[in-house]
């Protein structure tokens, strides 16, 4: 009996004894927007951390659809994420509400991030007081993607270049454009249109203009909201409709010819259209627009060592390039690998690489068709024209000497990508000067949101809702009247 009791005790103690020999594995918990990372880098980070620190770690990776859903999850306090990736305005809101940790620059560091992040973006963060709380991940602009030939056909021109937000209101383009179903993006555009006369009095290349556009897109007094509301109703009456994500394909199929777009989505559509032989372009209109960014922040209680090390890992130029190739958006990271990627996508190297691919195809299968393809590639390489673009503002201090032209960073870009993919991803300083960062609307958030709800509700919807309410009310009154009549009759019968 004692022997059986001893065996039972040993069996019960076995898991405890085994666990004593196991290392406790730390886990980094990451909360990111959907489709916003090459998930292969998560496994790579585990290996990177082990090689650097000799410690095995694990990860949990969750995604969210919107900034608001992310915020609500963090606000409950029931989660313990080490990193999340909100957009600029949400970062500001979370900092203001004390929902994020400051980076620890003493015990840990963000050296790799600071070494490789674009100086333009580092300066932007410093100016706005975000450096201690957030690390820039992806960035871009808000502008218009359009089909020049479709628009040109409506104004009897051979070509058409969109230069103003006012094109949303052109009678010739009625029913040809779509607007994002996004209150902040729509507000930005309408506010610029409302204040176009004020903006036109200032030189768009001046520092004063940058200050003014920043102010204009963030004006949310009751009077400003009313003016923006009226302008949005005017826009809505002339466009095809509102969209969340469908316009990326609709502009390729010809359902629309112009759309309010984030630069990353615009590149996707331009690439997709190119495969179908359709030319699309992207522009930030002359009046200006919005420069946006998404960044990593640490919610309260985060493991700062794991979080900051992950940011450093993502800031390695080769990892940033891998991410860009996967998701299509523009990384905040500069460095040699990003320069090479730009050249491979849009520069002389892109055409040389295409010739090499055609040559390899012909060598493997020497058909007439493949020979014609090779000849066309060689002819294009010989005839292609290029523009030298100064990207010093983005790359300064992040490149090896071999990439420098004196003290400048010059990239040679195939002209077919100018006004299209390349300038969509890397706008020049003149464009950025007429772009502002949108702020959190703070106490006016609910007012602006209600305004947008009202704008989206068309007259037919309002009439339908009012009619439905009236019908339900009438039905309830009839039921109550019927019941009252029934009981009245019953009382009369009982008296008899």
Spans of features found by a protein language model:
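Extracytoplasmic ligand-binding site segments that recognize negatively charged/polar headgroups
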Residues: 32-40, 87, 95-255, 269
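Mature extracytoplasmic/periplasmic domains
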Residues: 294-426, 492
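C-terminal motif of bacterial Sec signal peptides marking the signal peptidase cleavage site
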Residues: 16-19
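Juxtamembrane/start-of-transmembrane alpha-helix segments at the extracytoplasmic/lumenal side
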Residues: 454-472
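Extracytoplasmic/periplasmic substrate-binding proteins
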Residues: 237-301, 343, 350
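Early extracytoplasmic/lumenal segment of secretory-pathway proteins
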Residues: 23-97, 113, 460-464
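Alpha-helical transmembrane segments
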Residues: 472-486
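Cytoplasmic C-terminal tails of single-pass
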Residues: 487-496
């Amino acid at each position: 009996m004692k022997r059986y009791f001893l065996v039972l005790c040993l069996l019960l103690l076995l898991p405890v004894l085994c666990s004593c020999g196991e290392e406790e594995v730390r886990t980094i918990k990451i909360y990111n927007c959907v489709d916003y990372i090459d998930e292969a880098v998560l496994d790579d980070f585990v290996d990177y951390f082990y090689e650097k620190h000799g410690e095995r770690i694990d990860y949990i990776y969750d995604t969210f659809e919107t900034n608001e859903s992310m915020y609500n999850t963090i606000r409950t306090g029931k989660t313990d994420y080490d990193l999340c990736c909100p957009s600029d305005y949400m970062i500001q809101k979370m900092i203001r509400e004390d929902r994020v940790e400051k980076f620890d620059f003493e015990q840990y560091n963000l050296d790799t991030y600071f070494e490789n992040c674009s100086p333009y973006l580092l300066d932007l963060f410093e100016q706005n007081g975000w450096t201690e709380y957030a690390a820039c991940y992806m960035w871009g602009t808000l502008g218009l993607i359009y089909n020049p030939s479709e628009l040109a056909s409506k104004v009897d021109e051979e070509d058409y270049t969109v230069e103003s937000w006012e094109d949303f209101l052109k009678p010739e383009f009625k029913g040809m454009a779509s607007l994002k179903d996004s209150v902040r993006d729509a507000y930005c555009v309408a506010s610029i249109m409302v204040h176009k006369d004020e903006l036109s009095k200032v030189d768009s290349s001046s520092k004063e203009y940058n200050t003014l556009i920043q102010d204009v897109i963030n004006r949310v007094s009751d009077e400003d909201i009313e003016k923006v509301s009226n302008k949005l109703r005017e826009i809505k009456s002339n466009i095809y409709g509102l969209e969340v994500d469908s316009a990326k394909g609709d502009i390729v199929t010809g359902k629309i010819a112009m759309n309010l777009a984030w630069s990353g989505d615009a590149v996707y559509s331009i690439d997709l259209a190119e495969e179908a032989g359709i030319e699309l372009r992207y522009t930030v209109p002359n009046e200006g627009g919005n420069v946006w960014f998404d960044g990593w922040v640490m919610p309260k209680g985060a493991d700062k060592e794991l979080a900051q090390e992950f940011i450093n890992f993502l800031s390695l130029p080769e990892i940033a390039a891998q991410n860009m190739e996967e998701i299509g958006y523009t990384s905040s990271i500069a460095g040699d690998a990003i320069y090479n990627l730009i050249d491979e996508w849009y520069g002389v190297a892109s055409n040389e690489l295409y010739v090499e691919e055609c040559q390899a195809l012909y060598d493997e299968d020497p058909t007439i068709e493949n020979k014609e393809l090779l000849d066309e590639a060689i002819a294009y390489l010989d005839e292609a024209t290029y523009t030298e673009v100064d990207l010093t503002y983005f790359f300064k201090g992040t490149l090896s000497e071999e990439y420098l032209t004196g003290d400048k960073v010059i990239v040679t870009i195939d002209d077919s990508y100018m006004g299209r993919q390349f300038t969509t991803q890397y706008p020049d300083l003149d464009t950025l000067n007429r772009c502002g960062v949108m702020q959190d609307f703070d106490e006016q958030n609910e007012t602006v949101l209600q305004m947008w709800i009202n704008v989206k509700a068309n007259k037919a919807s309002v009439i339908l809702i009012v009619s439905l309410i009236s019908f339900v009310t009438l039905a309830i009154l009839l039921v109550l009247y019927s019941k009252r009549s029934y009981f009245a009759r019953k009382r009369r019968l009982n008296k008899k």
